[in-house]
Amino acid sequence: MVKKFQQPRAAAATAHPAATDAALRVIYSGGNAVDAAIAAQAVICVVMPDAAGLGGDVMQLVRMPDHRVEALTGSGRSPAVAPDRWLSQGGSSVTVPGIVDGWCTASARWGRLPLAASLAPAIEIARASRASSQLIAARDEQRARLAAHGASGWSLMSTQPGHWWHQPELADILTSIAADGREAFYAGAAAQAIVDATRHYGGSLSLDDLAQHSSEVADPVSIDWQDGALHVQPAPSQGIVLAMAAQWLTRSAIDPADREHALVEATEAAFQFRDFAGRPPGRMLSEALEIDLSVAQHRAGPRGYLHTAGVAVADSEGWVVSSLVSVFDDFGSAVLVPELGFVLNNRAAGFTSGDNAPRASARPVHTLAPAMLSVGDTALGLATPGADGQVQTILQVLSRLTTGTEGLQLAELDDAIARPRWRSQDGRLLIEGDHPDQLDLSVRGHRIETRRPGDPIFGAVVAAGTTGGAPFAAAAHRRGVTKEVR
């Protein structure tokens, strides 16, 4: 059950305790939830470089006190000159990093404090050093990839669990961004260092590619959901897949005994349209999902990528942010920019075929898909890592929050997030061993693959919102995510 607090001003749920603390500190320093979300995202870039970094992207939904919702797309395009070969790692997998311009855009459009105030906690952590987390240090299998792409001298490579990890280069570039904004990153010496790193390892990114980058702010894709609206990230995000599946559920009379099976089938049917996510949302939402609940269809749409980090923040003024930051795969492309202290994304690995085929100056369909639910004066932001698992996890949580005819049941938020989950992947149905519907789903023909309860493959939901003027937050027990209301 969501806990009640006396006149709280701020609520945050994030992928790391230091990020949650930074978000709340910024609000208590006079900022709003947007300033706080930037602070949390920046801290994650410092303490979780396997998941996110300055070489990656940000997607976020912002709900304003007047109840309007806008979407920020902070992702970049592939180079204007295509590489000789498109690979899933190395320089040719890198698209223009979008997160820094995303911060600058969000701060200028919705924030209250200077960007420097939001970046201060991350700079402090990077400058003073932070104990290496078990999560980072345990990724020994990534060391060979990193070493092959110039990271042998990166301080992280020699850091053991619990030891101090020094990041002066990262602190310096963050300090420059705090002082000079996007120009400190997309021009000059920093831009040249990014270009040099990608080209040394087979990429074709240019200074012009970086200079011409800009974030996009647009309306979200919205559908009716119970007595309110569900908002998802617009293209190039695959959030439309969530909207398509959710819309089918709202328009279908489903027997409660069939609901979990129906969720799986709706997810898999919607994922057949993933590569067309860039088409007009009205056209996508008018597509008929081919769903036959008589038997499992085993459609192989969702894939097995995992990483990313979530940030959800709300304040007592009515600002709510639901966001995700990512370098895509663990440590992205594995290409280190040594002068700046971060690795670059491998978002070009998201290209597939057809509308989403690899090409120059294009944004691949993007896995980051935060969501926002609006019902009257209540707003709820939801986000989770897990690539193609994101929309599946959010759909399951939403379904558990709005069963029956009682509308949104915020009292069930913690339980809805904590309950065992499944994940459709490559024609199989991965499922937590304590899921109550495991046997029923098997009988219906799903190819069950049981995983241990709490396996990180099932995501790590962060949630924050406001109701009746009071902010609240919730978080899953998976992957060490944290929440705090203050």
Place the predicted regions along the sequence by residue.
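Conserved catalytic alpha/beta cores of large enzymes that bind or transform nucleotide phosphates
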Residues: 352-428
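Active-site rim segments in enzyme catalytic domains, especially the processed small/beta chain
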Residues: 34, 46-53, 61-63, 70, ...
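Catalytic phosphate/nucleotide-handling subdomain of diverse soluble enzymes
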Residues: 182-270, 336-337, 342-343, 350, ...
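Short beta-strand scaffold segments in enzyme catalytic cores
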Residues: 52-64, 309-314, 370-372, 458-467, ...
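Extended C-terminal subregions enriched in glycine
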Residues: 276, 280-282, 317, 362, ...
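Short, small/polar residue-rich loop motifs at catalytic or cofactor-binding pockets
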Residues: 217, 305-308, 330, 366-368
